[in-house]
């Protein structure tokens, strides 16, 4: 029984989903300008659960649709569906249950806009990216990155309903950060795993355009990212605490991207990939801490 539960747990890509729901949680905290009301706490808790269920469902559908590809790649050849621990119909039913629960919770317990945006993001990743973009273009990560960048807006929507223009603008800034972060994050991994992607006929950028070109694109997007991460300060959403942290995190990421250029180094690409995860977690954590510090200063004074 425990082994079977573990198989279903692995279908949800728990580490990936943890980062997704963390950014959604930060979106919730930043959306509340003061002490949250009982209604906001309830909406936030249900929103968190609904977003987690949807992300888990998307991960399961991704594994269902990518089973043949996963079987050809060393990184994914262990997955439960690939090795026969679960059957395709079981994955389909599992994902269907998660989606049903997610949409029910978000529609009835949170608000309609959160449910609609969450479902749209799920389809964007699990179907449009997985079935079409991933297999068709080397810009798959860039075009499909919007679906994966949406969680902060989903969290923001859960507690505010995105009822004002300011809500949309501020939530969009958080989405923009993840959207621009996604290419250097995934391309660093793709450099390290390019033989796997080539074997599976997936047109990732290092496969179609080479490692040197991909490294230059990683640096370009990292430069853009270092600018985008300053926008929350420029709009007044965040303050000097976040600014200082962002500048340090950006400087380190830029160093990784620059170091990756000459000579192209597969092992260093994996280190860059690892740092990109730490980077995003830390950046959003500092966004949240900065928000709390500014609230505390407001109430103390």
Curated annotation (Swiss-Prot):
Residue ranges the record marks as coiled coil: none
Reactions that this protein is recorded to catalyse: heme b + (2E,6E)-farnesyl diphosphate + H2O = Fe(II)-heme o + diphosphate
Entry annotated with the keyword Transmembrane helix: yes
Any one biological process term the GO annotation gives: heme O biosynthetic process
InterPro entries: Protohaem_IX_farnesylTrfase, UbiA_prenyltransferase, UbiA_prenylTrfase_CS, UbiA_sf
A GO cellular-component term linked to this record: plasma membrane
Extra information: Carbon 2 of the heme B porphyrin ring is defined according to the Fischer nomenclature.
Name under which the protein is recorded: Protoheme IX farnesyltransferase
Taxonomic lineage of the native organism: Bacteria, Pseudomonadati, Pseudomonadota, Gammaproteobacteria, Lysobacterales
